[in-house]
Amino acid sequence: MKHVSSPHPCAAIASARVWLGLVLVALLAGCASQAPSPDQSRDRGDWEAQIERLQTLDAWSLAGKVGLRTNEGSESANIDWQQRPDTYRILISGPFGAGRTLLTGRPGAVTLTNGEGRFEAETPEALMEQQLGWSLPISALDYWVRGLPAPEGGERIEHDEQGFPQQLRQFGWTIEYRDWTRADTLWMPRRLVMTYGELRATLVANQWQLLSDT
């Protein structure tokens, strides 16, 4: 087991090998059982009506695809992300690397398992810094994929005609919400594009599921 300490959470992007590692850890499968409903019936007021519930939503799953593009090229992979109040499990599979990469986390401990072994750190940011030489604000992604800013603040938000988030800027990242889908009684982002310098990451959620928090 390899242990690393917690570094600064936002280091610079350096090479094509770096962005490949991004998907293995950052976006936390393509075998989703059903397609989401088309984004065609959002109304003004829907976002305000659900935002309080979104802010307290801490048990959900997301399955779909993630794509990355830098100056060096582009790739895509399948993603299966399960979030619980105190734990998360993110499985990345497909063309990235050989086989599967599994990221699991709980307070104070994050583990990444892939074909090269098992690696552990106190935070996902520290794990990325150790393995890739840079890191993302991973802890913020839990909020961004729900259409919310991370609670640390400093965000700038633009809304569309229906009052839903259209663009979010935070921690040097720009998150664009391109499409929405219905999950139970909530509207959830279906397609979002995140950019930071030369890095562009696109997440397409083929399936959202709201889970029991037990």
Curated annotation (Swiss-Prot):
GO biological-process terms attached to the record: lipoprotein localization to outer membrane; protein transport
InterPro entries, alphabetized: LolA/LolB/LppX (IPR029046), OM_lipoprot_LolB (IPR004565)
Subcellular location(s) per record: Cell outer membrane
Superkingdom, natural source: Bacteria
Stretch forming the signal peptide: 1-30
Gene Ontology CC entries for this record: cell outer membrane
Membrane-related topology note: Lipid-anchor
Family label: Belongs to the LolB family.
Lipid-anchored residues (N-palmitoyl cysteine): C31
Job description of the protein: Plays a critical role in the incorporation of lipoproteins in the outer membrane after they are released by the LolA protein.
UniProt subunit comment: Monomer.
Protein name (record): Outer-membrane lipoprotein LolB
Lipid-modified residues, S-diacylglycerol cysteine kind: C31
Organism annotation: Chromohalobacter salexigens (strain ATCC BAA-138 / DSM 3043 / CIP 106854 / NCIMB 13768 / 1H11)
Cited SUPFAM superfamilies: Prokaryotic lipoproteins and lipoprotein localization factors
